[in-house]
Protein backbone atom coordinates (compact mmCIF):
# COMPACT_ATOMS: atom_id res chain seq x y z
CA UNK A 1 0.00 0.00 0.00
CA UNK A 2 3.03 2.28 0.34
CA UNK A 3 2.92 3.29 -3.35
CA UNK A 4 -0.78 4.16 -3.56
CA UNK A 5 -1.67 7.80 -4.20
CA UNK A 6 -4.59 7.83 -1.75
CA UNK A 7 -5.36 5.39 1.03
CA UNK A 8 -8.94 4.94 2.21
CA UNK A 9 -10.07 5.70 5.73
CA UNK A 10 -8.26 3.30 8.13
CA UNK A 11 -11.46 2.30 9.93
CA UNK A 12 -14.82 0.62 9.36
CA UNK A 13 -18.05 2.57 9.79
CA UNK A 14 -20.53 0.68 11.99
CA UNK A 15 -23.01 3.35 13.11
CA UNK A 16 -24.34 6.18 10.93
CA UNK A 17 -26.30 9.38 11.57
CA UNK A 18 -28.72 10.40 8.80
CA UNK A 19 -28.59 14.04 7.69
CA UNK A 20 -31.21 15.93 5.74
CA UNK A 21 -30.80 17.90 2.54
CA UNK A 22 -32.34 21.37 2.36
CA UNK A 23 -33.13 23.88 -0.38
CA UNK A 24 -31.26 27.11 -1.03
CA UNK A 25 -34.34 29.11 -0.05
CA UNK A 26 -34.55 27.22 3.25
CA UNK A 27 -30.87 27.87 4.00
CA UNK A 28 -31.08 31.56 3.14
CA UNK A 29 -33.93 31.96 5.60
CA UNK A 30 -32.09 29.93 8.27
CA UNK A 31 -28.88 31.97 8.09
CA UNK A 32 -30.81 35.25 8.29
CA UNK A 33 -32.70 33.97 11.36
CA UNK A 34 -29.36 33.05 12.94
CA UNK A 35 -28.18 36.64 12.61
CA UNK A 36 -25.64 35.69 9.92
CA UNK A 37 -23.83 33.66 12.56
CA UNK A 38 -23.34 29.94 11.80
CA UNK A 39 -22.87 29.26 15.53
CA UNK A 40 -26.58 29.97 15.95
CA UNK A 41 -27.81 27.55 13.27
CA UNK A 42 -29.62 24.39 14.35
CA UNK A 43 -27.45 21.35 13.66
CA UNK A 44 -30.31 19.58 11.87
CA UNK A 45 -30.19 22.34 9.24
CA UNK A 46 -26.50 21.67 8.50
CA UNK A 47 -25.50 19.18 5.78
CA UNK A 48 -21.74 19.07 6.46
CA UNK A 49 -20.67 20.50 9.81
CA UNK A 50 -17.15 21.94 9.76
CA UNK A 51 -17.69 24.36 12.65
CA UNK A 52 -15.28 22.53 14.95
CA UNK A 53 -13.52 19.25 15.59
CA UNK A 54 -14.15 19.68 19.32
CA UNK A 55 -16.18 16.71 20.51
CA UNK A 56 -17.89 16.31 17.14
CA UNK A 57 -16.11 13.24 15.80
CA UNK A 58 -16.40 9.49 16.22
CA UNK A 59 -14.98 7.51 19.14
CA UNK A 60 -13.10 4.23 18.92
CA UNK A 61 -14.59 0.90 19.96
CA UNK A 62 -12.06 0.67 22.80
CA UNK A 63 -13.17 4.07 24.09
CA UNK A 64 -16.81 3.07 23.95
CA UNK A 65 -16.09 -0.20 25.74
CA UNK A 66 -14.12 1.61 28.46
CA UNK A 67 -17.22 3.54 29.49
CA UNK A 68 -18.69 0.34 30.91
CA UNK A 69 -15.96 0.40 33.59
CA UNK A 70 -17.11 3.76 34.91
CA UNK A 71 -17.07 4.16 38.69
CA UNK A 72 -19.61 6.85 39.52
CA UNK A 73 -18.45 7.39 43.11
CA UNK A 74 -18.58 11.07 44.06
CA UNK A 75 -15.07 11.01 45.51
CA UNK A 76 -12.09 8.72 45.06
CA UNK A 77 -13.47 7.13 41.88
CA UNK A 78 -11.25 4.41 40.45
CA UNK A 79 -12.02 5.94 37.04
CA UNK A 80 -10.20 9.08 38.17
CA UNK A 81 -7.13 7.04 39.05
CA UNK A 82 -7.23 5.34 35.65
CA UNK A 83 -7.23 8.78 34.03
CA UNK A 84 -4.44 10.09 36.26
CA UNK A 85 -2.35 7.02 35.40
CA UNK A 86 -2.77 7.70 31.67
CA UNK A 87 -1.63 11.28 32.22
CA UNK A 88 1.47 10.13 34.12
CA UNK A 89 2.38 7.55 31.49
CA UNK A 90 1.85 9.81 28.47
CA UNK A 91 2.89 13.27 29.66
CA UNK A 92 4.92 12.52 32.78
CA UNK A 93 2.74 14.84 34.89
CA UNK A 94 2.11 13.90 38.51
CA UNK A 95 -1.03 15.85 39.40
CA UNK A 96 -4.31 15.66 37.47
CA UNK A 97 -7.58 17.57 37.77
CA UNK A 98 -10.33 16.55 35.31
CA UNK A 99 -12.62 19.28 33.98
CA UNK A 100 -15.71 19.29 31.80
CA UNK A 101 -13.71 20.79 28.90
CA UNK A 102 -10.74 23.05 28.22
CA UNK A 103 -12.30 26.30 29.37
CA UNK A 104 -13.09 24.63 32.68
CA UNK A 105 -9.35 24.28 33.19
CA UNK A 106 -8.75 27.88 32.09
CA UNK A 107 -11.23 29.38 34.52
CA UNK A 108 -9.36 27.60 37.32
CA UNK A 109 -5.67 28.02 36.55
CA UNK A 110 -5.63 31.60 35.25
CA UNK A 111 -6.74 33.35 38.47
CA UNK A 112 -4.54 31.01 40.52
CA UNK A 113 -1.39 31.86 38.54
CA UNK A 114 -2.18 35.59 38.63
CA UNK A 115 -2.61 35.46 42.41
CA UNK A 116 0.60 33.45 42.82
CA UNK A 117 2.60 35.97 40.77
CA UNK A 118 1.10 38.82 42.76
CA UNK A 119 1.98 37.26 46.12
CA UNK A 120 5.45 36.01 45.22
CA UNK A 121 6.70 38.59 42.71
CA UNK A 122 4.64 41.70 43.40
CA UNK A 123 2.76 41.58 40.09
CA UNK A 124 1.00 44.86 39.27
CA UNK A 125 -2.47 43.91 38.01
CA UNK A 126 -2.75 47.15 36.05
CA UNK A 127 0.34 46.20 34.04
CA UNK A 128 0.12 42.41 33.73
CA UNK A 129 0.54 40.78 30.33
CA UNK A 130 0.49 37.09 29.40
CA UNK A 131 2.26 35.81 26.28
CA UNK A 132 1.58 33.03 23.78
CA UNK A 133 2.50 31.92 20.29
CA UNK A 134 -1.24 32.54 19.80
CA UNK A 135 -3.94 32.43 22.44
CA UNK A 136 -7.01 30.33 21.73
CA UNK A 137 -10.15 32.45 21.97
CA UNK A 138 -11.37 31.13 25.34
CA UNK A 139 -7.88 31.40 26.87
CA UNK A 140 -7.79 35.01 25.75
CA UNK A 141 -11.29 35.55 27.12
CA UNK A 142 -10.53 34.09 30.55
CA UNK A 143 -7.32 36.12 30.74
CA UNK A 144 -9.16 39.34 29.93
CA UNK A 145 -11.97 38.58 32.38
CA UNK A 146 -9.26 38.36 35.05
CA UNK A 147 -7.83 41.71 33.97
CA UNK A 148 -4.83 40.31 32.12
CA UNK A 149 -3.80 41.72 28.76
CA UNK A 150 -2.70 39.09 26.24
CA UNK A 151 0.03 39.40 23.66
CA UNK A 152 0.64 36.98 20.79
CA UNK A 153 4.28 36.63 19.74
CA UNK A 154 4.39 34.62 16.51
CA UNK A 155 6.89 34.37 13.67
CA UNK A 156 6.54 36.55 10.58
CA UNK A 157 5.71 33.52 8.40
CA UNK A 158 2.74 32.49 10.56
CA UNK A 159 -0.10 34.21 8.70
CA UNK A 160 1.42 34.63 5.24
CA UNK A 161 -0.66 32.22 3.16
CA UNK A 162 1.81 32.59 0.30
CA UNK A 163 4.67 31.13 2.34
CA UNK A 164 5.31 27.47 3.14
CA UNK A 165 7.20 26.93 6.39
CA UNK A 166 7.49 23.76 8.46
CA UNK A 167 6.62 25.25 11.85
CA UNK A 168 4.38 28.27 11.39
CA UNK A 169 3.13 27.87 14.96
CA UNK A 170 6.51 28.77 16.47
CA UNK A 171 7.06 31.50 19.03
CA UNK A 172 8.90 34.62 17.94
CA UNK A 173 11.57 34.06 20.57
CA UNK A 174 13.11 37.51 20.28
CA UNK A 175 9.67 39.07 20.48
CA UNK A 176 8.85 37.00 23.56
CA UNK A 177 11.95 38.05 25.48
CA UNK A 178 11.64 41.64 24.34
CA UNK A 179 8.01 41.71 25.51
CA UNK A 180 8.88 40.23 28.90
CA UNK A 181 11.57 42.86 29.42
CA UNK A 182 9.21 45.61 28.29
CA UNK A 183 6.40 44.85 30.77
CA UNK A 184 8.71 43.56 33.50
CA UNK A 185 9.08 39.83 34.21
CA UNK A 186 7.22 40.09 37.50
CA UNK A 187 4.15 41.35 35.62
CA UNK A 188 3.96 38.23 33.43
CA UNK A 189 1.80 35.65 35.26
CA UNK A 190 2.16 32.88 32.64
CA UNK A 191 3.18 31.94 29.12
CA UNK A 192 0.86 29.69 27.10
CA UNK A 193 2.27 27.43 24.40
CA UNK A 194 -0.59 26.47 22.06
CA UNK A 195 0.04 23.21 20.19
CA UNK A 196 -0.88 23.19 17.43
CA UNK A 197 -1.51 26.91 16.88
CA UNK A 198 -5.20 26.88 16.02
CA UNK A 199 -5.59 30.52 15.01
CA UNK A 200 -2.55 30.33 12.72
CA UNK A 201 -4.16 27.45 10.82
CA UNK A 202 -3.50 24.39 12.96
CA UNK A 203 0.21 24.99 12.50
CA UNK A 204 2.76 23.03 14.55
CA UNK A 205 5.41 24.20 16.98
CA UNK A 206 8.84 22.59 16.79
CA UNK A 207 10.49 20.95 19.76
CA UNK A 208 13.52 23.19 19.28
CA UNK A 209 11.26 26.24 19.57
CA UNK A 210 9.51 24.89 22.67
CA UNK A 211 12.87 24.20 24.31
CA UNK A 212 14.08 27.72 23.61
CA UNK A 213 10.80 29.25 24.83
CA UNK A 214 11.00 27.25 28.06
CA UNK A 215 14.58 28.38 28.60
CA UNK A 216 13.45 32.00 28.37
CA UNK A 217 10.59 31.33 30.78
CA UNK A 218 12.93 29.72 33.31
CA UNK A 219 15.34 32.65 33.01
CA UNK A 220 12.56 34.91 34.28
CA UNK A 221 10.89 32.31 36.53
CA UNK A 222 7.61 32.48 34.57
CA UNK A 223 5.33 29.41 34.56
CA UNK A 224 4.56 27.80 31.20
CA UNK A 225 1.19 26.21 30.44
CA UNK A 226 0.90 23.90 27.43
CA UNK A 227 -2.46 24.36 25.70
CA UNK A 228 -2.67 20.73 24.65
CA UNK A 229 -5.83 20.32 22.59
CA UNK A 230 -3.93 18.98 19.58
CA UNK A 231 -0.83 17.53 21.20
CA UNK A 232 -0.80 14.37 19.05
CA UNK A 233 -1.08 16.25 15.75
CA UNK A 234 1.80 18.46 16.85
CA UNK A 235 3.89 15.39 17.69
CA UNK A 236 3.13 13.93 14.25
CA UNK A 237 4.37 17.09 12.52
CA UNK A 238 7.54 17.02 14.63
CA UNK A 239 8.15 13.43 13.54
CA UNK A 240 7.63 14.37 9.88
CA UNK A 241 9.48 17.69 9.80
CA UNK A 242 12.10 17.84 12.58
CA UNK A 243 14.90 15.54 11.45
CA UNK A 244 16.19 14.81 14.93
CA UNK A 245 12.92 13.05 15.81
CA UNK A 246 12.05 11.20 12.59
CA UNK A 247 12.70 7.79 14.20
CA UNK A 248 10.93 8.59 17.47
CA UNK A 249 7.44 7.31 18.22
CA UNK A 250 4.54 9.69 18.78
CA UNK A 251 4.57 8.62 22.43
CA UNK A 252 8.27 9.45 22.79
CA UNK A 253 7.89 12.84 21.12
CA UNK A 254 4.90 13.65 23.32
CA UNK A 255 6.81 12.80 26.50
CA UNK A 256 9.73 14.95 25.35
CA UNK A 257 7.42 17.85 24.45
CA UNK A 258 5.97 18.07 27.93
CA UNK A 259 9.36 18.53 29.55
CA UNK A 260 9.13 22.10 28.29
CA UNK A 261 6.13 23.21 30.33
CA UNK A 262 5.12 23.26 33.99
CA UNK A 263 1.40 22.64 33.51
CA UNK A 264 -0.96 21.49 30.81
CA UNK A 265 -4.51 22.58 30.11
CA UNK A 266 -6.42 20.51 27.61
CA UNK A 267 -9.67 20.42 25.79
CA UNK A 268 -9.73 16.64 25.48
CA UNK A 269 -12.47 16.95 22.85
CA UNK A 270 -9.85 17.21 20.11
CA UNK A 271 -6.90 14.81 20.06
CA UNK A 272 -8.20 12.67 22.92
CA UNK A 273 -11.31 12.15 20.74
CA UNK A 274 -13.95 12.39 23.49
CA UNK A 275 -17.27 14.25 23.10
CA UNK A 276 -16.77 15.97 26.46
CA UNK A 277 -13.83 16.38 28.82
CA UNK A 278 -10.78 18.38 29.77
CA UNK A 279 -7.64 18.23 31.88
CA UNK A 280 -5.59 20.50 34.11
CA UNK A 281 -2.29 18.89 35.15
CA UNK A 282 0.90 19.91 36.96
CA UNK A 283 4.28 18.37 36.23
CA UNK A 284 5.77 17.88 39.68
CA UNK A 285 6.02 18.99 43.30
CA UNK A 286 7.34 22.43 42.36
CA UNK A 287 3.75 23.25 41.37
CA UNK A 288 2.03 21.43 44.22
CA UNK A 289 0.87 24.75 45.71
CA UNK A 290 -0.78 25.61 42.38
CA UNK A 291 -2.35 22.16 42.28
CA UNK A 292 -3.77 22.66 45.78
CA UNK A 293 -5.27 26.05 44.91
CA UNK A 294 -6.69 24.72 41.65
CA UNK A 295 -8.28 21.76 43.42
CA UNK A 296 -10.06 24.20 45.74
CA UNK A 297 -11.41 26.22 42.81
CA UNK A 298 -12.39 23.01 41.02
CA UNK A 299 -14.76 22.11 43.85
CA UNK A 300 -16.56 25.43 43.45
CA UNK A 301 -16.58 25.68 39.66
CA UNK A 302 -16.38 22.17 38.19
CA UNK A 303 -17.03 19.54 40.84
CA UNK A 304 -15.11 17.40 43.30
CA UNK A 305 -11.46 17.13 42.14
CA UNK A 306 -11.71 13.41 41.39
CA UNK A 307 -14.47 13.91 38.83
CA UNK A 308 -14.33 17.58 37.82
CA UNK A 309 -17.67 17.64 36.04
CA UNK A 310 -17.21 14.27 34.31
CA UNK A 311 -19.01 11.01 34.99
CA UNK A 312 -16.89 7.97 35.72
CA UNK A 313 -17.52 6.43 32.32
CA UNK A 314 -16.38 9.64 30.63
CA UNK A 315 -13.10 9.57 32.59
CA UNK A 316 -12.51 5.95 31.54
CA UNK A 317 -13.20 6.88 27.92
CA UNK A 318 -10.76 9.79 28.16
CA UNK A 319 -8.09 7.59 29.75
CA UNK A 320 -8.22 5.38 26.64
CA UNK A 321 -8.76 8.19 24.13
CA UNK A 322 -5.46 9.82 25.08
CA UNK A 323 -3.73 6.69 23.79
CA UNK A 324 -5.97 6.09 20.76
CA UNK A 325 -5.44 9.65 19.54
CA UNK A 326 -1.69 8.98 19.24
CA UNK A 327 -2.05 6.09 16.78
CA UNK A 328 0.40 6.77 13.95
CA UNK A 329 -1.75 5.33 11.13
CA UNK A 330 -4.70 7.35 12.35
CA UNK A 331 -2.70 10.59 12.48
CA UNK A 332 -1.23 10.00 9.01
CA UNK A 333 -4.73 9.53 7.57
CA UNK A 334 -6.18 12.55 9.36
CA UNK A 335 -3.48 14.96 8.26
CA UNK A 336 -3.56 13.56 4.70
CA UNK A 337 -7.32 14.23 4.61
CA UNK A 338 -6.74 17.89 5.47
CA UNK A 339 -3.96 18.09 2.87
CA UNK A 340 -6.30 16.61 0.23
CA UNK A 341 -8.89 19.30 0.93
CA UNK A 342 -6.33 22.12 0.82
CA UNK A 343 -4.83 20.80 -2.43
CA UNK A 344 -8.28 20.57 -4.02
CA UNK A 345 -9.21 24.11 -3.01
CA UNK A 346 -5.95 25.55 -4.29
CA UNK A 347 -6.40 23.74 -7.62
CA UNK A 348 -9.57 25.78 -8.22
CA UNK A 349 -7.86 29.04 -7.23
CA UNK A 350 -8.94 29.32 -3.59
CA UNK A 351 -5.93 30.49 -1.57
CA UNK A 352 -5.40 28.60 1.69
CA UNK A 353 -3.01 28.62 4.59
CA UNK A 354 -0.67 25.63 4.28
CA UNK A 355 -2.40 22.49 5.52
CA UNK A 356 -2.39 22.09 9.27
CA UNK A 357 -3.49 19.24 11.45
CA UNK A 358 -7.23 19.67 11.89
CA UNK A 359 -8.61 22.07 9.30
CA UNK A 360 -8.26 23.82 5.98
CA UNK A 361 -8.03 27.59 6.42
CA UNK A 362 -9.25 29.61 3.44
CA UNK A 363 -7.80 33.11 2.97
CA UNK A 364 -11.07 35.04 2.84
CA UNK A 365 -9.25 38.34 2.56
CA UNK A 366 -7.89 37.26 -0.83
CA UNK A 367 -11.12 35.66 -2.02
CA UNK A 368 -13.20 38.71 -1.03
CA UNK A 369 -10.80 41.67 -1.33
CA UNK A 370 -13.70 44.11 -1.68
CA UNK A 371 -14.86 43.49 1.91
CA UNK A 372 -12.84 45.41 4.55
CA UNK A 373 -11.69 43.71 7.75
CA UNK A 374 -14.25 45.57 9.89
CA UNK A 375 -17.02 44.03 7.76
CA UNK A 376 -15.67 40.53 8.45
CA UNK A 377 -14.94 38.92 5.06
CA UNK A 378 -14.45 35.43 6.50
CA UNK A 379 -17.79 35.61 8.32
CA UNK A 380 -19.46 36.73 5.10
CA UNK A 381 -17.79 33.82 3.31
CA UNK A 382 -19.07 31.40 5.96
CA UNK A 383 -22.62 32.60 5.39
CA UNK A 384 -22.31 32.27 1.61
CA UNK A 385 -20.88 28.75 1.90
CA UNK A 386 -23.87 27.75 4.02
CA UNK A 387 -26.33 29.26 1.54
CA UNK A 388 -24.69 27.47 -1.40
CA UNK A 389 -24.18 24.00 0.07
CA UNK A 390 -25.41 23.73 3.66
CA UNK A 391 -21.80 23.61 4.91
CA UNK A 392 -21.14 25.23 8.28
CA UNK A 393 -17.64 26.65 8.83
CA UNK A 394 -16.19 29.17 11.28
CA UNK A 395 -14.48 32.55 10.98
CA UNK A 396 -10.95 32.93 12.36
CA UNK A 397 -10.26 36.61 11.88
CA UNK A 398 -11.32 40.06 13.06
CA UNK A 399 -14.79 38.90 14.11
CA UNK A 400 -13.29 36.31 16.46
CA UNK A 401 -10.43 38.49 17.67
CA UNK A 402 -12.76 41.18 18.97
CA UNK A 403 -12.06 44.55 20.51
CA UNK A 404 -9.38 45.89 22.81
CA UNK A 405 -11.02 45.64 26.27
CA UNK A 406 -9.44 48.94 27.32
CA UNK A 407 -10.09 51.10 24.24
CA UNK A 408 -13.08 49.34 22.68
CA UNK A 409 -11.40 49.48 19.27
CA UNK A 410 -11.29 46.52 16.91
CA UNK A 411 -8.04 44.62 17.38
CA UNK A 412 -5.95 44.33 14.21
CA UNK A 413 -5.99 40.79 12.85
CA UNK A 414 -3.06 39.34 10.89
CA UNK A 415 -5.32 37.41 8.50
CA UNK A 416 -8.99 36.90 7.67
CA UNK A 417 -9.40 33.12 7.55
CA UNK A 418 -12.34 30.74 7.20
CA UNK A 419 -11.72 27.48 9.05
CA UNK A 420 -13.07 24.26 7.56
CA UNK A 421 -12.62 22.00 10.57
CA UNK A 422 -12.63 18.25 9.95
CA UNK A 423 -14.28 16.17 12.71
CA UNK A 424 -12.41 12.94 13.41
CA UNK A 425 -13.46 9.80 11.51
CA UNK A 426 -16.74 11.44 10.46
CA UNK A 427 -16.47 12.55 6.83
CA UNK A 428 -15.05 10.69 3.83
CA UNK A 429 -13.11 11.79 0.76
CA UNK A 430 -16.45 12.18 -1.05
CA UNK A 431 -17.37 14.87 1.45
CA UNK A 432 -14.06 16.63 0.76
CA UNK A 433 -14.85 16.58 -2.98
CA UNK A 434 -18.29 18.06 -2.29
CA UNK A 435 -16.73 20.88 -0.24
CA UNK A 436 -14.33 21.67 -3.08
CA UNK A 437 -17.22 21.75 -5.56
CA UNK A 438 -19.17 24.06 -3.25
CA UNK A 439 -16.28 26.52 -3.30
CA UNK A 440 -16.36 26.55 -7.10
CA UNK A 441 -19.89 27.95 -6.86
CA UNK A 442 -18.94 30.38 -4.09
CA UNK A 443 -15.96 31.64 -6.09
CA UNK A 444 -18.14 32.32 -9.15
CA UNK A 445 -20.30 34.69 -7.08
CA UNK A 446 -17.54 36.11 -4.87
CA UNK A 447 -17.80 39.68 -6.19
CA UNK A 448 -21.46 39.87 -5.11
CA UNK A 449 -20.92 38.77 -1.50
CA UNK A 450 -21.60 41.61 0.95
CA UNK A 451 -19.86 42.57 4.17
CA UNK A 452 -21.53 42.39 7.58
CA UNK A 453 -22.25 44.72 10.48
CA UNK A 454 -23.49 44.08 14.03
CA UNK A 455 -27.07 44.14 15.20
CA UNK A 456 -26.03 42.64 18.58
CA UNK A 457 -22.48 42.51 19.95
CA UNK A 458 -21.59 40.83 23.28
CA UNK A 459 -18.59 42.25 25.15
CA UNK A 460 -16.75 38.95 25.63
CA UNK A 461 -16.25 36.13 23.09
CA UNK A 462 -18.67 37.90 20.77
CA UNK A 463 -18.30 35.46 17.88
CA UNK A 464 -20.30 32.78 19.70
CA UNK A 465 -23.55 34.72 20.13
CA UNK A 466 -23.33 37.96 18.13
CA UNK A 467 -25.87 38.77 15.43
CA UNK A 468 -25.17 40.59 12.19
CA UNK A 469 -26.76 41.75 8.97
CA UNK A 470 -25.50 42.47 5.47
CA UNK A 471 -24.17 45.96 4.83
Swiss-Prot record:
Keywords, alphabetical:
Acetylation, Cytoplasm, Lyase, Pyridoxal phosphate, Tryptophan catabolism
> Per the database entry, which stretches of residues form a coiled coil?
none
Report the GO molecular function annotations: identical protein binding; L-cysteine desulfhydrase activity; lyase activity; potassium ion binding; pyridoxal phosphate binding; tryptophanase activity
Matches recorded under Pfam families: Beta_elim_lyase
In-chain residues carrying the UniProt-annotated modification N6-(pyridoxal phosphate)lysine: 270
Induction, as annotated: Repressed by cold shock.
Give EC number(s), comma-separated.
4.1.99.1
Q: Please state the pathway this protein functions in, per its UniProt record.
A: Amino-acid degradation; L-tryptophan degradation via pyruvate pathway; indole and pyruvate from L-tryptophan: step 1/1
Instruction: Read off the InterPro entries from this record.
Output: ArAA_b-elim_lyase/Thr_aldolase, Beta-eliminating_lyase, PyrdxlP-dep_Trfase, PyrdxlP-dep_Trfase_major, PyrdxlP-dep_Trfase_small, TNase, Tryptophanase_CS
Task: List the GO terms this entry assigns under cellular component, sorted alphabetically.
Answer: cell pole; cytosol; membrane; protein-containing complex
Q: N6-acetyllysine is carried by which residues?
A: 5, 115, 156, 450
Query: PANTHER family attached here?
Result: BETA-ELIMINATING LYASE-LIKE PROTEIN-RELATED (PTHR32325), TRYPTOPHANASE (PTHR32325:SF4)
- Subunit structure of this entry? Homotetramer.
State what protein this is by name. Answer: Tryptophanase
Q: Which gene encodes it?
A: tnaA
Amino acid sequence: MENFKHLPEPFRIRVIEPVKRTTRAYREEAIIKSGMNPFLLDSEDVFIDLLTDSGTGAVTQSMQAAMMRGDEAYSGSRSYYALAESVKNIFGYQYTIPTHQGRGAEQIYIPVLIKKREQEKGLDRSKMVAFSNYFFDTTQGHSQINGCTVRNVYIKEAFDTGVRYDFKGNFDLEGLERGIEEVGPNNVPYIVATITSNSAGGQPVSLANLKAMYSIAKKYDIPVVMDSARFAENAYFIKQREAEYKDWTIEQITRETYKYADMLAMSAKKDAMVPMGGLLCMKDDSFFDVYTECRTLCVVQEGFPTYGGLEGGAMERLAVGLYDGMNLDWLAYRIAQVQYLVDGLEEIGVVCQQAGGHAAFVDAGKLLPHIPADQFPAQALACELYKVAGIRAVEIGSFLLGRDPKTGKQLPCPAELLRLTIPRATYTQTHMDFIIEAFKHVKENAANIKGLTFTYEPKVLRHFTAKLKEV
